[in-house]
């Protein structure tokens, strides 16, 4: 297994797919990186040379990935909550943020239904 950006990427997979194991790198961005470095998309990670791996590592450091990206996202959410905008309030209450209805199907965000004592149909 090759280690890139602090993540062990699987050696038996194609490079394009293996790079998507890094948080913040999707298929499109991994294709773009491989095109810039002139590395074939079909080559397996175990067949990469050490020079190709080092160039991949240096290219990926240019992007915000893994811990830095996760920290950036959480700080953005905290900032929204601090300034008191609508999106921040929805985050604080644990409700859908992007305008979805909550009467029926917001169970993923809201969590398990809470039973109300004394309420029967």
Swiss-Prot record:
InterPro entries: Rbsml_uS13_C, Ribosomal_uS13, Ribosomal_uS13-like_H2TH, Ribosomal_uS13_bac-type, Ribosomal_uS13_CS. One of its GO terms (biological process) is translation. Residues 98-121 are annotated as: Disordered. Residues 109-121 have a biased composition (Basic residues). GO terms for molecular function: rRNA binding; structural constituent of ribosome; tRNA binding. GO terms for cellular component: cytosol; small ribosomal subunit. Keywords: Ribonucleoprotein, Ribosomal protein, RNA-binding, rRNA-binding, tRNA-binding. It comes from the Bacteria. Part of the 30S ribosomal subunit. Forms a loose heterodimer with protein S19. Forms two bridges to the 50S subunit in the 70S ribosome. Located at the top of the head of the 30S subunit, it contacts several helices of the 16S rRNA. In the 70S ribosome it contacts the 23S rRNA (bridge B1a) and protein L5 of the 50S subunit (bridge B1b), connecting the 2 subunits; these bridges are implicated in subunit movement. Contacts the tRNAs in the A and P-sites. NCBIfam families: uS13_bact. Belongs to the universal ribosomal protein uS13 family. This is Small ribosomal subunit protein uS13.
